[in-house]
Amino acid sequence: HTRELGDTLAAIAEDKSHVITGEQKCVYFAEQEPEVLEVLVRRAEAMQVPYKIYGRDFQAENIHYTCSGMLFDVVIGDNTYPDLQIPLLGEHQAKNCALALAVCMDVMADLCRKSDTPDIFSETMCNQIRRQLSAIHHPGRMEILSSDPFILLDACIHSASCENVKDVLRHLGIQNCTVIVGIPEDKDYAGVARSMKDVAARIILTRSGNPHYHFSQKQQESLAEEGIGTIWTDSVKQALNLADSCPDPIVILGTTSVISEVERIFQRS
């Protein structure tokens, strides 16, 4: 939405920063580009809201890829939560988990001061955190729908997010994929196709049935002008059937409506 928000990271951050209203006890900043962090910090200080920053106040360390997801430690202040595992793929998932835990620990610390809530830093609490994290299910977020054949589903709608997808594929030793792209024309479908072409044996374009989003075969024509060959399909089901006819691993990238349709199809099957 660059028309409404601006065409630079700093301009977009300036708009988004107004969620900091001065009423918050604390705000938490994920890993950011320097110009974005500068805007967010300036807003927090102007509104006199305390803030915590990834890499300074909390962070994920010792991040490893496994066949079951990500394994890592989370450091919050002087405390370390070791050997946490989440059934999601991508280094960013570990970093997002660190941010979420930092928020939760502060909320729990407040509760501990006000009640008889168990010590949040006890070994019992750490084990409970591990159990809950290992049971996370987050549809369409680097979700492995199948391991044989390999099918990865992610709600990626811009080229920047493709780097996370490609990083996962590199760590898993996967290449020459059939890539299904279901991204509306007002989003970065072209950037996603450009980014994924070097790991794609073929790129299949598709559309969701949600009338709120606009898809058309002009996407295929536009990419062809850049020398990127694609196959157009009129539905998610058609795209999946076409992908299934090939022996290659499958990566499905798309907007939330496309993700929902894929999930429904796999649930039925």
Spans of features found by a protein language model:
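Acidic, Mg2+-coordinating active-site environments of NTP-dependent enzymes
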Residues: 1-83, 97, 101-115, 120-124
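Beta-strand->loop->alpha-helix junctions that form or flank phosphate-binding loops
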Residues: 29-33, 45-65, 86-91, 126-136, ...
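C-terminal helical cap/extension that packs against the catalytic core
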Residues: 30-52, 150-151, 159, 193-249
